[in-house]
Amino acid sequence: MTKNGDDDKEALPIWLSKAADRIVGHMNSDHSNSIVSTLHAQFGVKDLGARMERLKVDGYYISSDKNLYFAKFTRKCSSVDEYREELIKHAQIYRKFEIP
């Protein structure tokens, strides 16, 4: 679902708040293909310029063409390790949606 992001500003748990900038920076610089694939798989949107923007415990927001899309995880995470596992899961299951 496309969201404008303004209506969904719940506070992050401390563990995610502390790690958010690092996770977002790492994903955008080293794993942008996974973000692009997730956007394509979950929303049918093909955008090589898609970027991870904001995190929540059950997923993250992807920006694409001035829209925000919420990429949902299969569960709510309660630690950085669980968050990493969900990101890896997305990379694995959505690999077939990579855009050449």
Roles of regions detected by a PLM:
Residues M1-P100:
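Binding-site signature for planar aromatic cofactors or substrates
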